[in-house]
């Protein structure tokens, strides 16, 4: 059987944003089908593994529960200067996003970016907290046309590194 460190490494490399957990479900199904008697995938994509007891007398039921999804962001608007406006996918605190490296994944193409905002001293106040409307992603595009050439578009999801 795989070592737990290898299992965790494999699982952490899968991009499984909220609402797009199918890749994780497929990995779990293929990797662990040899250890169980039945696998059920329901209409919401949840994966259930069943291992029958060898001895039904005095057997205990055990359940292990885990999320298959991760948080992320989605493009809501492309600015003329090439910056991307974003919104959250899943429960994440806005301030946690600031300075995070992210990856847009589109058809085997990975487009890296970093989340930024206008610093408080430039905004003219000491309020460090940023609403989503104050955050943007820099992907290195010099303008909107360059961002569009990189296949960036509204509703494109991305993974937070």
Which stretches of residues belong to each language-model region?
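N-terminal hydrophobic/helix-forming segments and targeting peptides
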Residues: 1-161
């Amino acid at each position: 059987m795989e070592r737990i460190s290898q299992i965790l490494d494999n699982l952490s490399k899968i991009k499984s944003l909220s609402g797009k957990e199918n890749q994780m479900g497929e990995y779990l199904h293929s990797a662990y089908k040899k250890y169980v008697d039945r696998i059920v995938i329901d209409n919401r994509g949840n994966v259930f593994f069943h291992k029958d007891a060898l001895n039904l007398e005095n057997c205990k039921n055990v359940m292990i529960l885990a999320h298959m999804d991760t948080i992320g962001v989605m493009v809501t608007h492309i600015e003329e200067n090439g910056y991307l406006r974003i919104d959250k996918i899943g429960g994440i605190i806005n301030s946690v996003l600031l300075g995070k490296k992210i990856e847009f994944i589109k058809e085997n193409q990975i487009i890296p970016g970093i989340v930024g905002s206008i610093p408080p001293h430039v905004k003219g106040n000491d309020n460090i907290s940023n609403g989503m409307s104050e955050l943007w992603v820099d992907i290195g595009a010099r303008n909107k046309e360059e961002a569009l050439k990189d296949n960036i578009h509204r509703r494109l999801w991305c993974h937070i590194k």
